[in-house]
């Protein structure tokens, strides 16, 4: 029986020694949002809980200030 081993996920913010995630850094925030505008969960991205909370807060602030869309599926 062959086992399938997945590559271990790592937190990008820990690796880069980020102190706090900024809501004005739109390029970084867009990597953690799906095409429909949802925040990607940490079990998929590998982000640690501390940074996932900061990420969610930053995304919500950016949405409130119209820096990010709430959804991309406007018809």
From Swiss-Prot:
Main function: Binds as a heterodimer with protein bS6 to the central domain of the 16S rRNA, where it helps stabilize the platform of the 30S subunit.
NCBIfam families in the record: S18 (TIGR00165)
Similarity-based family: Belongs to the bacterial ribosomal protein bS18 family.
Quaternary organization: Part of the 30S ribosomal subunit. Forms a tight heterodimer with protein bS6.
PROSITE patterns: RIBOSOMAL_S18 (PS00057)
Gene: rpsR
GO CC annotations, alphabetized: cytosolic small ribosomal subunit
Keyword annotations of the record: Ribonucleoprotein, Ribosomal protein, RNA-binding, rRNA-binding
Organism the protein comes from: Baumannia cicadellinicola subsp. Homalodisca coagulata
Keyword tRNA-binding: no
Name the UniProt record assigns to this protein: Small ribosomal subunit protein bS18
Any one Gene Ontology molecular-function term assigned to this protein's record: structural constituent of ribosome
Any one of the GO BP annotations: translation
């Amino acid at each position: 029986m062959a086992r399938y081993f997945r590559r271990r996920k790592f937190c990008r913010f820990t690796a880069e020694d980020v102190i706090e995630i900024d809501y004005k850094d739109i390029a970084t925030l867009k990597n953690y949002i799906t095409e429909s505008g949802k925040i990607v969960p940490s079990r998929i991205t590998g982000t640690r809980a501390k940074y996932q909370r900061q990420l969610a807060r930053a995304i919500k602030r950016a949405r409130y200030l119209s820096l990010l869309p709430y959804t991309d599926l406007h018809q």
